[in-house]
Amino acid sequence: GLTDDQDALTIKDVFSDLKHCYPLVSKSAEDAYDAMQHFTEGRLVSLWYSDGSGELESAASKLCFPKDTSLPGTPQNNAIAERNNKDILQGTRTLLAQAGLPCAFWVKAAPAYCVLDNTEPREDGFSPWYHTHGEEFKGLRLPLGCAVIYFPAGTKDSGATEKWDIT
């Protein structure tokens, strides 16, 4: 990839449908802890459901999350997580293909897909972002790799351009 990230942690809030994919350098409890803490942002977690992997169990314990685990080796017992993973994978591939970017950009595309999906209104007229944060997303919803024209804010001329002028 573009970074040292070799793994990913996908998380889904079943109540709000909010999801995210965190590229991780390793499958360590520390990396999992940071991702889980960022995702929950201090919100109450009524149940943390996982596949029971050691790093997730350790991180959930450190965060004082009530835990439950699926049966090991039986993905059909964890259909919500498996479907979330499939959705993020398909959405990430679509963004990469649409942008014409190589697979190495997955570390940018996966989180970008999640933000775009999280801010899209559902059948009830509200987005998962709204159900989580109590207000709709205020930022621009731009797909990964789209062409943009950037206009920097006005700044004081420091004369640096004259320093580098070759004429």
What are these regions (language model features)?
Residues 80-141:
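Charged alpha-helix within mobile-element recombinases
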